[in-house]
């Protein structure tokens, strides 16, 4: 039986990535695409590279008959999914790619996103969408909250280590290089080609990045105490990808062994042989995350590097992976995409 999906916010990059993935999914059919500001336009007008798919035209959300929908992907700006979720039929599965349900405490949402939570009564239903660590809860969930792309990249590098006793939890430094698609598709002066080309610059520095809320939430639960990491992202002039370099106090061979054991049976997480480090280009367009570990000339220091495609494994691919579990489908269905290289 084919399951019918609606994508809300389909005119953005994550919406287009969902369409690209679902176009070859054997069990999920795209039944509706919404984008209020572009309603009435053909999808091929917004994304000409998907012209061959013969997709439904974009409509306003209120034009969708959700009683005929099995699954909703919300790829909406912050604040728009919260009031919507409670209005959808209870039998509809929902995967929110935005930030509206990532943080369990509505006060944390207010702190990091500057908005009052519009659906605190719904928040307890939401399961955090880092698939590899919340698989059992996701299978039974009605609502899954996708992670931030930076949050996913760093957590894949660090989660197996946080409660292991192998690293100093008070000495974690994470330096990220981010492709510009993570900033979305809307026009921004600092994202113009002349502004970004041939430049690397930090942003949201000094403990201000919103994804820090996810690290605080997840790592502190794992450790059983407060954990605060130092985290600085940088924009680099590439379209897709995130590469996180995590500097740790710990024995590097033991760190590598712990990560290799944790991910030995994971279909989308690849831990490279000790001493090999991953490249952003080797995961672009795929749902894979590559992780490498090496030592340093300073004894007792480890470098863990993780990389993934922010639009795929960091967002839309993760969303489909979660949807597969929610719908009782094989987790890898439609997702064994080979990376695009060169």
Curated annotation (Swiss-Prot):
Gene Ontology biological-process entries: L-arginine biosynthetic process
Catalytic activity of the protein: N-acetyl-L-glutamate 5-semialdehyde + phosphate + NADP(+) = N-acetyl-L-glutamyl 5-phosphate + NADPH + H(+)
Enzyme Commission code(s) on record: 1.2.1.38
Alphabetical list of InterPro entries matching this protein: AGPR_type-1, NAD(P)-bd_dom_sf, NAGSA_dehydrogenase, Semialdehyde_DH_NAD-bd
Annotated metabolic or biological route of this protein: Amino-acid biosynthesis; L-arginine biosynthesis; N(2)-acetyl-L-ornithine from L-glutamate: step 3/4
Keyword terms: Amino-acid biosynthesis, Arginine biosynthesis, Cytoplasm, NADP, Oxidoreductase
MF term (GO), any: N-acetyl-gamma-glutamyl-phosphate reductase activity
One GO CC term, this protein: cytoplasm
Keyword NADP tagged: yes
Active site: 149
Subcellular location(s) of the protein: Cytoplasm
Listed NCBIfam families: argC
Family of this protein: Belongs to the NAGSA dehydrogenase family. Type 1 subfamily.
PANTHER family xref list: N-ACETYL-GAMMA-GLUTAMYL-PHOSPHATE REDUCTASE, CHLOROPLASTIC-RELATED (PTHR32338:SF10), N-ACETYL-GAMMA-GLUTAMYL-PHOSPHATE REDUCTASE, CHLOROPLASTIC-RELATED-RELATED (PTHR32338)
Function: Catalyzes the NADPH-dependent reduction of N-acetyl-5-glutamyl phosphate to yield N-acetyl-L-glutamate 5-semialdehyde.
Name of the molecule in the record: N-acetyl-gamma-glutamyl-phosphate reductase
UniProt organism field: Paracoccus denitrificans (strain Pd 1222)
Gene (UniProt): argC
């Amino acid at each position: 039986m084919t399951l019918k999906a609606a994508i809300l916010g389909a005119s953005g990059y994550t919406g287009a990535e969902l369409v690209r993935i679902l176009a070859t999914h054997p069990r999920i059919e795209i039944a509706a695409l919404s984008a209020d500001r572009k309603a009435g336009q053909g999808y091929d007008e917004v994304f000409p590279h998907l012209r061959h798919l013969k997709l439904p035209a974009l409509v306003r959300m209120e034009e969708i008959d959700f009683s005929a929908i099995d699954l909703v992907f919300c790829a909406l700006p912050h604040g728009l999914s919260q009031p919507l979720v409670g209005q959808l039929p209870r039998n509809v599965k929902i995967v929110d790619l935005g930030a509206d349900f990532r943080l369990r405490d509505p006060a944390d949402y207010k702190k990091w996103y500057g908005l009052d939570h519009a659906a605190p009564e719904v928040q307890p239903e939401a399961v955090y969408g880092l698939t590899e660590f919340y698989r059992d809860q996701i299978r039974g969930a009605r609502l899954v909250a996708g992670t931030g792309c930076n949050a996913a990249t760093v957590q894949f590098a660090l989660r197996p280590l946080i409660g292991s006793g192998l690293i100093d939890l008070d000495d974690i430094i994470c330096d990220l290089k981010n492709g510009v698609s993570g900033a979305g598709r809307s026009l921004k002066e600092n994202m113009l080609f002349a502004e970004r080309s041939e430049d690397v610059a930090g942003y949201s520095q000094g403990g201000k990045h919103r994804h820090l809320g996810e690290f605080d939430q997840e790592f502190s639960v794992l450790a059983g105490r407060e954990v605060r990491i130092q985290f600085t992202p940088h924009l680099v002039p590439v379209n897709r990808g995130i590469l996180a370099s995590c500097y740790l106090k710990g024995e590097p061979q033991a760190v590598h062994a712990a990560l290799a054991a944790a991910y030995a049976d994971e279909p989308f997480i690849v831990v490279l042989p000790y001493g090999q480090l991953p490249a952003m280009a080797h995961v672009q367009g795929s749902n894979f995350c590559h992780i490498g570990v090496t030592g340093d000339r300073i004894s007792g220091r480890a470098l863990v590097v993780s990389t993934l495609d922010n639009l795929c494994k960091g967002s839309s691919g993760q969303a489909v992976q979660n949807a597969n579990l929610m719908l009782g489908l094989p987790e890898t269905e439609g997702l064994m995409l080979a990376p695009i290289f060169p």
